[in-house]
Amino acid sequence: MTPKTFVATLKEHQIDVSQKQLDQFEIYFERLVATNQNVNLTAITEKEAVYLKHFFDSVAPTLYLESLRTMPLNICDIGAGAGFPSLPMKILFPQLKVTIVDSLNKRIHFLEELVAELGLTDVTLVHDRAELFSQVKRPYREQFDMVTARAVAPMNVLAEFCLPAVKVGGQFVALKASQSDTELAEAAFAIETLGGQLKEDIAFNLPETNDPRHLVIIDKVQSTPDKYPRRAGVPVKKPLMAKEEK
């Protein structure tokens, strides 16, 4: 996907990209590739692949969720790595207030420099583990209108990382590259236990490559019990499952 095609494809979805925003994406691409030589940010470095599989993929939620386009949502991106999906969404929709959480300080340093160079405001960067970020008595617990995650972890693990940070009435949006038929069913217990309720699983394909993608949207319908998230490492080693599933 060339930058020109990126702009044209978004326009088909009634999203206009200004020259300033296009320049910001170009700076993003250049800094991503340059920094990646020293810090492991991405395996994808070819320009057209970055525009498709990082930039377009990251803004996909805005094609389906009007609130991201029109409201000043307070969103949190957990395990954002090189800033995906939150920073591409922030570039297109500057009214969003973004908090990015990542456990690797080198990635946070990259994002600090990038955010400054892009001239973005209302972006907070937090160096922390997902399991610690939203524990009881931490200032970020149940504070966000929306929490996003673009990760390969199973949904029952992502739910424990992300739902505790979502305020009641907010949403958790998982961007999944692929999803087994059973993954959501296996995550149902975790989602309910953590105060969530599955709203929708939107399946779509990336343009040009037809790579499958899923947006899993979970409403936060009640407060997360105090004991979640569990201590660092436990959600991955012992994902939440109903007793009969174990």
Swiss-Prot record:
S-adenosyl-L-methionine binds at G79, F84, A130, E131, R150. Pfam families: GidB. It comes from the Bacteria. Keywords: Cytoplasm, Methyltransferase, rRNA processing, S-adenosyl-L-methionine, Transferase. Gene3D superfamilies: Vaccinia Virus protein VP39. One of its GO terms (molecular function) is rRNA (guanine-N7-)-methyltransferase activity. GO terms for cellular component: cytosol. This is Ribosomal RNA small subunit methyltransferase G.
